[in-house]
Amino acid sequence: MVADLEGEGKVFGLFGILDGATVKNLTIGAPEGDASELTFSAAGTADAGVVAGACMGSCIENCVSYVPMYVKGNSVDNKRTTMAAFAGFMYTGVEETEVSVLKDLVNYGSIKVEAGANTKNGATSVHGAGIAGLSNRHTESTFINTINNCVNYGEMTSAVPRTSGILAAANQYTVIESCKNYGNQTNSAAGTRVGMITCVLGGQCHMRDCENYGDAIMTGANAQVGGLVCLLNDNSVEVTGGGNYGKVISDIDASPAGYKGTLAANFSKFAKVDNVVAGGAVGKYNGGEYVMETITEDNYMDYIGKYSSANAEKITNIIFKGEDVKTPGIATAQDLIDFAAAVNSGASIENWQDAQGTVVLLNDIDMKDVAVWTPIGNGKFSGSVSGGNQHISEYEGAAFTGVFDGKGYSIRNLKLVADLTADQTAYGLFGILDGATVMNLTIGAPEGD
């Protein structure tokens, strides 16, 4: 999908405009061997998405995108330009049936954003994000846009002020809930207003239980940046639960002097911020040689972002985690071996589980150096009774009983070689699954495996 969008009001994507529609259970692109792309430039107002340019009172659910995205900028200044994997522009109308919902979406595609001649940093700027570009509502509507349980793994390379893992700008009446960003962002723009979940929360916008694990690396001058959000911009705004675990890097001074923080850059106007984890780290870019702040349990509130003494009482129950928090999940062959050993011994598996208790792959796993594989859930059947159409089996030892999400990644060069001398012994990547779910996993490959 490649286009030069000339003129006003252009939309572009697999779908241009969704109006009262539903798109679900769709995968676009693939981890490898796929040449899909979304690349466009604009000369006027434009909204583009891999799935849809504009989502108007519609639902996009349970979809995955691997498609790399690149907006080359807008040749006209002060013209809204949006790009994201699922909806460039998200809009709710005046009726209850005109609500837009994005849920259970995963983006793996890289995100590259350039400004062109558009130098603005507000609603009429260039926006790029993993899930949606900008959300808004009809001026007479009181209904809410919803982005729920969405994840971005796409790496972000940006030269514009507004780029985020989930939603570049929650302009009005939007709830972002249970979303996670794992993508890192390197941004060279001056005067950024970057947040890794969203850049701004406006009127009647709430963020609930959202987590950022990506690093925000701002290389330009006067770059405002927050681990979750840059600007809280309305007295109705709420941020509850979740937290930041990524680095926040910019040459701008850290709070309280400047607009940079583990949670937000600027706590300007809001109703409450409660029960949020202030993890990760804060530092100056310093030409690439980071100079990190020393953040402790005694001073961590000084580094969550800039807020006034009048607003301090609305910021409650902030939880300090410090830096170097490891992203939970399986990232290497050794991680997979260790996870199997933990399941088989009955030990804790929390090091490989996300906040929902799901065991997740963080990337492709190459098992070429593992000569012998011991299954996850290495139990064996101890007896069975068969009669008629009934069969009752019993096993002893370990079984995997949880949820394993491959996140679309693959396990390759897995050598499953066994001598099953004991009767009714189970063998595979998993030995015995008991009440478990295994999903979104590729084993092997067409070539090189």
Pin down the residues of each PLM region.
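Surface-exposed repetitive/solenoidal architectures
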Residues: 1-449
